[in-house]
Amino acid sequence: MEIVINNISGLNNSFNNNNNSNNNDENEINFNLIKESIVNFKLWDINNKQIEYVCRLGSGSLCRVYKGRLNGKPVAIKVFSPIRFEEFKTEFLMMQSLRSSPFLISFYGVSIVEEPQKQCYCIITEFCSRDSLYHIMTDRLIEIGWNRFFQFSMQIILGLQSLHNRKPKPIVHRDVTSLNILVNEDWECKISNFSASRFNCLNTEYINSNNQNKSFAFCSPESSDFQDIDDDYTSLSSSITSKSDIYSFGIIMFELISRIINGEYSHPFSEFKDIKNDFQLLLSSKNGLRPSLPNICPEPLEKLYKQCVDQSPLNRPSCEEVIISLNQIRSFYLLPQTKKSWDNLVLKNKCK
């Protein structure tokens, strides 16, 4: 039985002590000005009275996430504090510009909610009941075989293709991780979390160097081509392109293949015990280190994985090329002798 909480401050009155300490006059924003300044905001503005907050699902450095209902329909609600206005604005501008795709999280609208002594911004999207791909892979009770691998991989790359082929400006996600791939009741993968995304990404971009939301294991080598500007920001190299997303997709391939063959989840780069922090991880990646697939990994999958995580972005395949390769590998897998051989790799883990 679901318990509806009409006042979300009753769940958690603040994001954290740091947010409270920063909740000063300069962070108090006139919300009427916000609605006027953000393109298309009014078209997507949802009256908060239409939204019911059911339960809190989790929280991160950027926002809190709730399960809720919009006019009786299950939804996910991301609540950003005032100091996270830029992240909210970026994600809204990205999501309202996306064309419809079955493998991108559906965007329903935005809302403004009042909490004690502050107002917060909300993004409302479809609710995915199976949580993230990461949570599915870490649950040993869920069986994942090669059919699921091809299903998940194809859905993710099709979602990326719809971003990279967007007209007139393509979108580079820049934070493709298994945590940002949500899975609905029908086992369909949905790319989510567009707060780090950018149009084109051909010019220099700026990111917060203290952003704890970034998953460094999925960062391409060119992502570490930065130089300090000041204490708060770094300048990213213009080399971050759609091929950086392909690298991240390759790391998700590693996660899935390792989970299938080993029977349990392996964090990317966890095999390298000398890597103690994110800086070492980024430096190691830049120097060519990659997570190692199990030595019994089928050769066609290993080849595609290595192409996706190639040191040079120019050598990585496009989404279209990955789709062709996945279809070819799946056809090869479905050959009776191949299927028997590959499926035996999974059966060995069940006997462990």
Swiss-Prot record:
**What is the taxonomic lineage of the source species?**
Eukaryota, Amoebozoa, Evosea, Eumycetozoa, Dictyostelia
Give the matching Gene3D superfamilies.
Phosphorylase Kinase, domain 1, Transferase(Phosphotransferase) domain 1
Q: What is this protein called in UniProt? A: Probable tyrosine-protein kinase DDB_G0290471
SUPFAM superfamilies (alphabetical): Protein kinase-like (PK-like)
Q: Does the keyword Transferase apply?
A: yes
Question: What EC identifiers does the entry list?
Answer: 2.7.10.2
Any one GO molecular-function label of the UniProt entry: non-membrane spanning protein tyrosine kinase activity
One of the GO biological process terms: signal transduction
What residues bind ATP, as annotated?
57-65, 78
What are the record keywords, sorted?
ATP-binding, Kinase, Nucleotide-binding, Transferase, Tyrosine-protein kinase
Q: Which family does it belong to?
A: Belongs to the protein kinase superfamily. TKL Tyr protein kinase family.
What sequence ranges are listed for the domain Protein kinase?
51-333
User: Which EC class does it fall in?
Assistant: transferase
The organism encoding this protein is Dictyostelium discoideum
List the GO terms this entry assigns under cellular component, sorted alphabetically: cytoplasm
Active-site residue numbers: 175 (proton acceptor)
**Pfam families hit by this protein:** PK_Tyr_Ser-Thr
- Spell out the reaction equation it catalyses: L-tyrosyl-[protein] + ATP = O-phospho-L-tyrosyl-[protein] + ADP + H(+)
